[in-house]
Amino acid sequence: MKKDPFHNSTVFWDTASVFVHHYLPDIRKVSPNTVIAYRDSMNFFIDYLDTQQNIKRKDISYNDFSKDTIRSYMDWMLNVRKLSPKTCNLRITAINSFLKYSTDQYPSLMAIYVAVSSLDMVKTTRKPIEFFERKQMKALLNAPDPRTRTGRRNRMMLILLYDTAARVSELLELTLD
């Protein structure tokens, strides 16, 4: 029979470890950067519980993931830490993802997941997308020297990045099959 996940810190830590080190990279196949972002988000929440809620790290359990605690964490991130709404939302999304994963392992945690996931995200304002003017784009694409192999490669990379809106890291991971 499985241990009570609500008050057992070992269950929490074991599940958190599997979530970060196995589930995200091996099952969900998210990028290494996403794994790092989710791990850091979990660590920031754990630090908050330790420093602001006076819950020792070794004593943290799912019982500490109440809707009120998450709401106060959001307020603390915005008003004390002065984090951007986008950063706050990222950290809450990571917690929600972890809790959703946890319900697969321990269905009795569903009430916690539902309560926390019902919290509204922080409203964000979208900045308008600024585009290069034709003259700027032409200057950028003409910057690499077309007489050299490296220049032609760099120009092609710039064109590919612009046309696909890919990140440089995504472009570098492309391989020929």
What residues fall within each predicted segment?
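Conserved catalytic core of the tyrosine transesterase superfamily
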Residues: 1-177
